[in-house]
Amino acid sequence: MRGSNLFQLTLALLLSLVAAEDGYNGWLRYAPVSCDLHCRQALPSHIVLLNSTKGSPIETAGRELKAGFQSILSTNLTFHPFQCDSSASILVATLDEYRQKCRDINLPELDPDGFWLQSEGDTVRILGNNARGALYGAYEYLAMVAQRNFSRVAYTTNPHAPIRWVNQWDNMDGSIERGYGGASIFFKDGTVVEDMAPVEQYARLLASIRINAIVVNNVNANATLLLPENMKGLGRIADACRPYGVQIGISLNFASPESLGGLETYDPLDPGVIAWWQNITDSLYTYVPDMAGYLVKADSEGQPGPDTYNRTLSQGANLFARALQPHGGVLMYRAFVYNDNLNESDWKADRAKAAVEYFKDLDGQFYENVVVQIKYGPIDFQVREPTSPLFANLYQTNTAIELEVSQEYLGQQCHLVYLPPLWKTVLDFDLRVDHKPSMVRDILSGQRFNRTLGGWAAVVNVGTNRTWLGSHLAMSNLYAYGRLAWSPTDDSEQILKDWTRLTFGQNRQVIDTIADMPMTSWPAYENYTGNLGIQTLTDILYTHYGPNPATQDNNGWGQWTRADHNSVGMDRTISNGTGYTGQYPEEVARLYESLETTPDDLVLWFHHVPWTHRLHSGLTVIQHFYNAHYAGSEAAHGFIRQWESLKGLIDRERYEAMRSRLVYQAGHSIVWRDAINNFYYNMTGIPDVAGRVGHHPWRIEAESMRLDGYQTYTVSPFEAASNTTAIITTSNSTTGTARTTIKAPSGVYDIGVNYYDLYGGQSKWTLSVGDKVVGQWLGDMEHQSLGHTPSIYLDGHSATRITFHGVVVRQGDQLKIVGEANGVEPAPVDYVVLLPPGVVD
């Protein structure tokens, strides 16, 4: 589909906004803005394209400009033949073509993908270093117009780094590992899908934020992607992305020569293996002549790699880099290599040290088209980690940072968490290599160590959900990733406001409210999950979603907290611990080696301290835990009130979808708060000085009610239930009733019911007070759009809350819950809470 057909598709997508706002267009809604007569007199009336061959990004730029002006301003721009100095026009060209066809123009230097934008009233010129840069300039101009910014501008902008990629962890069967927004848009049933429309729309969104490549499949790769029919399918994906200047790459399974090719080895130094990969690579480039390259995960979490044959990681990486070199491809090699069977009884054992231990001595041994892809922290996308020291240990090797837009450990898009402030703690961190300024962002750009290749990768994992990520507000993270990959000094809040204007419109209250909520969301989530550098206290052995702090310890995965009755934290000092601090340059090592100079927010990452240790804040560690978890949950409840203030200012579909998600988050934040506080109170025996932990005067424990057809059930882990116990029906096909007499004073209450919504069943509950039914609900979250990894157990993942507001209660009324079991779900209930107005518990 090309030319006018593509324009009609783009315009149809935009006009569909009149009927519905489902999020499919993201920040490219091109919603109408006001433009009076004076404003319209200063608008261009036609588009002039230079060398707009079919399917080129410049042709795409023209199509986007035409559709955008039609949608935003109801203005029909016409295409005119090329003229060098056409007035009342938008001219789009590459700089070289413009200079050849028109005249030389004195501009600041343009790097690959960079562009120059000049807007002077009705005349706009967009010149790119290449066609992709010209398209980026068109999107930049449209973003200005969509925000009702018609100012005169003239500036050049260049990318921070050449690599600005996204990674998809899509599997060949159509599932997505750590994906929370539906099934794959690329694969189904072992092959590439036929419908490329979502792929094209995804490429369009990526191009608008200046992302230049997608790795389309999971790093835990399936070798069948390399079958001829799937190579042909990759060609179709590339064809859909190419008009937007987005290249594709693929992840490889290191053992493919053996598992797919029938060889007896996958030794990277074996001539037969080398020849096999060269043949595969050459074949891929016949289908995808502009393929960006490969991504490889090796010797990690069960994935095969060069270590099988006692070969180095650089020898493994160079195997693929050599095959890519004739085609100009790049090999991204993940630094996520570690031993997942560590011995916790060894005080010196430390997973955080793995990346430097594996890669530092190989510095300078990687081919020039190899980029080592390094997670922002040394463990795994935690709510807070120190900057990976590997960035300071590779001087002669290209590097890229790996971020995660998909909220694997951070609420899985069911919790609002705006990630740029977290990313900024790493990007802006000064590693002080050789006692010189060494910002991580300057290492990524190549500026610090004089490298020409490097940059950015983010695990995104969009899916078939119309919101792409499962949540409207989560798309702010994808938008911000593109903005920061282009210009990492941009302000997180300003990026958010730009995204809000493009996504939700120009209303000042909407902009201010949505800017405030996400900007406080990461601190809130950190508060009610894991504090002081202890990591996200989620279940690392199961879903990576709900609370289960015990899973951090007593296994070989190395995400230990070393918490016991007396003390907590990892001692990573040189003097008495694992020696991890010594992997940093001297100034940073000295900062973290001392308990006195280590910031509170990382104290448990670097030091093992008593629970009664006083922080710089003056609080003890345990009291900080208690306070933070209460504060975080309070903040999550505040998000609901803030969002509800926007009712009528946002279209109903997106308003209701986001409100239900925020209500869920608030309820789950209570689950998190109580689970973590109860776990550590039980461990330490140290009470909360404010008397909150374990004290819930508004609650009625389900097991204390009169039960008929229900029985008590001891929940595991214990902290996933308010009083360690819940109730379940006596069988999975019966009905249970729980009754109690209300002792609270008569009045108006919000009544919350904490229950468990298990995967594989749809129980039905009915809540009554007196002779009135307050509400009914189903345990059907797996059929809603929440998307988080489900659980078949009563635990911190399945625990949730439903709240009925403004219920009139009389003292002495009977409160009754009737639960009808279904499937594997025995209508489980934890407790009921009667909350006076303004109380959170």
From Swiss-Prot:
Q: Name one GO molecular function term.
A: alpha-glucuronidase activity
Positions annotated with a glycan in the UniProt record: 51, 76, 149, 222, 279, 310, 343, 450, 465, 527, 576, 682, 723, 732
Q: Which keywords accompany this UniProt record?
A: Carbohydrate metabolism, Glycoprotein, Glycosidase, Hydrolase, Polysaccharide degradation, Secreted, Signal, Xylan degradation
Q: How does activity depend on pH?
A: Optimum pH is 4.5-6.0.
- Keyword Signal recorded: yes
Q: What induces it?
A: By xylan and xylose but not by glucuronic acid.
Residues in the signal sequence: 1-20
Per the record, the GO terms for biological process are: xylan catabolic process
Q: Does the keyword Aminoacyl-tRNA synthetase apply?
A: no
Localization recorded for this chain is: Secreted
Catalysed reactions, semicolon-separated: an alpha-D-glucuronoside + H2O = D-glucuronate + an alcohol
Q: Name one GO cellular component term.
A: extracellular region
Disulfide linkage: none
Its domain of life?
A: Eukaryota
Task: Tell me what the record says about temperature and activity.
Answer: Optimum temperature is 70 degrees Celsius.
Family membership noted in the UniProt record: Belongs to the glycosyl hydrolase 67 family.
Q: What does this protein do?
A: Alpha-glucuronidase involved in the hydrolysis of xylan, a major structural heterogeneous polysaccharide found in plant biomass representing the second most abundant polysaccharide in the biosphere, after cellulose. Releases 4-O-methylglucuronic acid from xylan.
Protein name per its UniProtKB record:
Alpha-glucuronidase A
Q: Report the source organism.
A: Aspergillus tubingensis
Instruction: Name the gene for this chain.
Output: aguA
